[in-house]
Amino acid sequence: ASACAQPAPKTGSSTPSSINDNDTKAHANYEEKNRQYREIDASLPALAPVWPDRLPSPNGSDSPRGVIVDLDLKGGTWSLGRIPAGRDVRPPEDPVLAAARSIPGTQRLSWEGSNALIATFTEPGPLQRNKLKPAMGFVFISATQHHVVDDDGHVAVPHVPSASATRTWFVLHTPEHPRAIALLMPGMLGTPEGMLELMAKRLMARDIAVLRMVAQPSRFTEHAEFVVPDRESIPALAGHIAQVFGDRTAECAYAAQAAFEHIFKAHPDLASVPRVAIGYSAGAMTLPTVLALEPDAYAAGVIVGGGCHYWLISELSNYATMIDAIVTNWGRTTPTADLRSDLAEAYLAHAPLDSFHTASILKGKPILMVQAKADLAVPTELGDVLWERLGKPERWLREGGHESLFFQHLPKDLDSIVAWIETSAKLRERPVEPKESNQP
């Protein structure tokens, strides 16, 4: 059955604004690409989540799907770098390598490849000294088993399976008397750093602890290219694409779940306060799936600049070339509008962990969407579809595009977002500080 058989009306405005990130030429290019796809039917039934396997963790781990290593925070700041194409990956530092080797089934372990993102903790520079200092920092490591296949399709070493490791870095900020804890998930490549830091500071000022995902899991941006040889290959190829997107999104959920278990052991007081999640851009796209892994654990969620249908976002986004994570190569096939739409529909029918499907699990939960009316990075139309899939929760629409949403509007909205969290997650009142007395 066609995944988008019945066109749905677009609910968001895509009127160009005067902001540079939404100039007329950019919109014309976007509209030309967008016309090559049939619109997504937001009324389709949801697929049940299918969570990919990970190698089981050793006894005593905080997570059934991996291990966690506490890190030397140095000055509490970090740098992020992508692995260049064709560059050999150096093994990580000894404690991380040893922890990964403790996972059963990792006799042959490979690390991240081209375009993957790696974090390194560093001393703060002159412009970083006003950053919040974390209470702790750590990395979650999981491993996925696979077999090396030779040119004839046979398993090369059948008795020694290979495993690929993925890392996700976190820091924790906690006030003296926490009223809640917020998972803060960034956009691609750990951005926008300044707005993430501002949000963390506003939350901390209101006695809300912050578990900050430094960046998406290391393989989230790893380069993968899919070649479409002909129309007949589309169903199988769509399943493969959906598997890659699903695996990367699931890792976000697994890492967040493990991170909470880890910090609850170090800070037991955090286990008894409400938990919320905030996602920016790519973090907003994956937020429904992160919450879908353990929906009862979260009291509320905030989606800033998010959308659904990951493959279509990767095709339409004006950030696609810069990110260079998932590339669809049509080879000698002429990519007609029908072929593109067929692939988009087939992908959705094979992608149970796309937020298009996991959003239905969150219906009835307090969700706030903050969305730009003319977003070309996470297309507004796909944000509209996510809003419908979530059951049309509270939504604040802002003029302009993706950059103006985060750098023009979000700084003004931070206090209102925090107030929304306090109300929606039903946080206890902050204690009234006693007034100073002049009496002896």
Regions found by a protein language model. Give the residues of each.
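N-terminal targeting or regulatory segments adjacent to alpha/beta-hydrolase or S9 domains
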Residues: C4-H159, R206
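Short beta-strand element of the alpha/beta-hydrolase
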Residues: W169, P178-G187
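Cap/lid segment of the alpha/beta-hydrolase catalytic domain
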Residues: M188-Y254
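Gly/Ser-rich "nucleophile elbow"/oxyanion-hole loop immediately N-terminal to the catalytic nucleophile
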Residues: P235-S281
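Hydrolase active-site cap/lid region
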Residues: P288-R340, L397
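Short beta-strand/loop motif that positions the catalytic acidic residue
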Residues: L362-K363, L368-Q371, D375
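Conserved alpha/beta-hydrolase "acid-adjacent" motif
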Residues: L376-L382
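Histidine-bearing beta->alpha loop at or near hydrolase active sites
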Residues: R398-F406, P411
